[in-house]
């Protein structure tokens, strides 16, 4: 799409009417003094908090810990603390023209002195011919690699140099020169010189959020670098080719199999790239009417369960941080009032943009964004994403999210045919979602983690056999129905499960959900149904009661339940306390038709 446009519109000509200033520098006092007081106060508080934080050491032993112990935090804690502290102090210095620059200069110099801007978990990830991290656990500074956070560090330093340029020069002109050379050495030169980084799409086609996320930051680095227009044009054209390869991997329905939470740095990062291209070309590169782009931008609104909750299939958080400013901007840009309204409701804070992996451009987008008043949002409709095979249905106080797809998705969980059920905006039947990333998360040991296993999703287990991972283990005969979806789950299991067919049907109405499973097996086997519940379940006469939820079960099932205390820090943000796994064991048979009815508890009716 982008490359095709550039065939008839040379980038060098497009750049003649654009700007290379993405945000106002600190000396533009009118702009910085016009920032809303709430944001000004928050920035001052953040800067005060980080002023008390000593610049942490980033050590070789901390970097090595990813290989020696599996810990990412030993390297990432000091790594991201440095960058959060720098971002907070830079924003504060932009507000205060008399701010002392010493601590900021220390942070800049320290980051420039780092052997690598790549985090330990991404070391040599994966460059053709490079040894595995276990054999090569420290970075080779002769072979710079660009990962997510190397590019993001370049963005932070580029903006720091632009925002505080004259004040940094007053300390020493060598500071900005050092920033420029480090960005060129670590990011811009490798970007132009090699096709080997997997996220570029030359060597691999299975691209994900890495591509737009990295490119959005490289574009900031390039725009602020004083390179000649011809060189910038070459870089932008190369980046557009990579964005096209990323877009080619996405389905026409705009769905992101990484989950709504990953839209932030997938579709949201794509929006960053498109905005930068619009600005530097004076609006000549604009793709607002492209149907696929519109679908990508609207994806989070289609996945909302209500009240800040989202359908959290795969490695998505149930209550993810999504940039409300990006959502609102996308909604305004595309004329999508539902998307804009969601963004206004999720407007967020400066601190949220700097938490986790600090994103200075998003913080600047937020504070210079003139938010609209929250409009009365229309009632959300149903969602059907035919390529992703995800369905959301809303009836009365109930919201159902269910999926088909396959078990080789990005950030995959073995969850073909699983579902999530909310009542009155509160979770009832849930997906546990994500945990803190470790060395196991994206390794051959991924499926030893309980939260990704089929046995912890809302699925049947046939003769002791759960679903298997891999793209070939997929749903069949997936059909949208007026009130839900039907699909055959048999293909998601291995041949050893002996399943001829396993049809699952979802039907939601204002009274609740009817879930029907019909199985034909090659021989008589015991089937077990798993439901993961938010509240503690009780069993009485074929009925499960869990908080405000009631599940009427078929006859002849044996009930048991287990508490799963949520001890993982990331998961606990979504599910403090415990989750509860229900087991319903049936008798041996070679065929069955089982109907489960989920409704409001009679004690509340």
Labelled PLM ranges:
Residues 1-43, 88-94:
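Extreme N-terminal leader/anchor segments
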Residues 17, 70-82, 133-151, 196-212, ...:
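Solvent-exposed loop and edge beta-strand segments that line ligand/cofactor-binding
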Residues 47-58, 104-122, 175-199, 234-254, ...:
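Long, well-ordered core segments of solenoidal/helical folds
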Residues 80-95, 106-110, 151-159:
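Non-membrane alpha-helical segments in proteins
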Residues 90-94, 155-162, 220-224, 268-279:
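Short glycine/serine- and small hydrophobic-enriched flexible loop segments
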Residues 124-128, 151, 343-353, 437-605:
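CBM-like, beta-strand-rich accessory domains located in the C-terminal region of large
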Residues 135-259, 365-376:
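Active-site lining segments of carbohydrate-active enzymes
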Residues 267-428, 480-482, 575:
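Carbohydrate-active enzyme catalytic cores, enriched for enzymes
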